[in-house]
């Protein structure tokens, strides 16, 4: 299979059929073999019913249903486990990501031998206060802390070699910095492509003021995993050595003081 498209979602029933149809149109135009994997992250609307209906009409559309909201990272991880394509795409379900970008990004993976290609929403059609400004700050700091020269870490539209998504463990809020996880697993050829970003057509954004807090916590996590990767004990071991040494010196001082 050429391509798997992994799409996490929460309460996006109105956009799913249109998204599925537009992806299928692109795939058929380029004769790609493909699958579309929707992961319903505990939606309270009719999203799952729509996924079941789409799946009943085409065995190329598959669905995973969470009984409650676990978060985007867990949804992506479940989709990665199920994916079979040589190239795995991630895409948001709100129709802001354009499926027409898929062929060029696929070519970058297969012919230019990138491990990962991240979309760059250079011209964003989002709230300036709640998305644009926080994203610019976050991306600047993420470049500094991770050493990865991306302009848009958090773009939902990404393409991966299959081996990459099978090697990383995405949990918590780590969906925001999958490129850092990939780099720490040895996948260092990371590319970027300017992509078309469209205005949200249905519903409202799921982001709010808490994005600022999450962004700050994300930066701490990026610094940690970029600095220590799979070797967190290097940090804790160093701290432990400092504490033990301090305790030893203090005990020696007390012992000397009693002599």
Predicted segments — roles?
Residues 2-4, 35:
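Cell-envelope/extracellular polymer assembly enzymes that use nucleotide-activated donors
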Residues 12-27:
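Short, well-formed alpha-helical segments that are part of the catalytic scaffolds
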Residues 14-18, 45-54:
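Acidic helix N-cap motif at the loop->helix transition within catalytic regions
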Residues 32-43, 64-65:
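Short beta-strand/loop segment that forms part of the nucleotide-sugar
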Residues 40-49, 95-96:
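A conserved acidic beta->alpha catalytic loop
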Residues 53, 62-68, 72-82, 87, ...:
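Acceptor/aglycone-binding surface of glycosyltransferases and processive sugar-polymer synthases
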Residues 177-259:
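Hydrophobic helical membrane-anchoring modules
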């Amino acid at each position: 299979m050429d391509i798997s498209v992994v799409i996490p979602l929460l309460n996006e029933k109105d956009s799913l059929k249109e998204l599925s149809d537009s992806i299928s149109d692109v795939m058929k135009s380029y004769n790609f073999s493909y699958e579309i994997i929707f992961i319903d992250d505990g939606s309270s609307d009719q999203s799952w019913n729509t996924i079941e209906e789409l799946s009943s009409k085409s065995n190329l559309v598959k669905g995973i249903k969470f009984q409650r909201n676990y978060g985007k990272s867990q949804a992506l991880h479940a989709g990665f486990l199920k994916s079979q394509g040589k190239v795995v795409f991630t895409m948001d379900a709100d129709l802001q990501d354009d499926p027409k970008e898929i062929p060029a990004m696929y070519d970058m993976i297969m012919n230019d031998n990138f491990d990962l290609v991240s979309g760059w929403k250079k011209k964003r059609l989002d709230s300036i206060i709640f998305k644009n400004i926080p994203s610019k700050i976050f991306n600047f700091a993420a470049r500094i802390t991770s050493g990865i020269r991306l302009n848009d870490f958090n773009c939902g539209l990404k393409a991966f070699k299959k081996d990459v998504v099978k090697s990383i463990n995405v949990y918590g809020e780590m969906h925001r910095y999958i490129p850092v996880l990939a780099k720490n697993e040895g996948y260092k050829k990371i590319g970027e492509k300017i992509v078309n970003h469209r205005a949200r057509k249905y519903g409202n954004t799921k982001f709010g003021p808490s994005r600022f807090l999450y962004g700050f916590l994300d930066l701490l996590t990026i610094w940690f995993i970029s600095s220590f990767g799979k070797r967190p004990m290097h940090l804790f071991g160093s701290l432990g050595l400092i504490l033990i040494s301090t305790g030893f010196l203090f005990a020696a001082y007390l012992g000397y003081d009693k002599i």
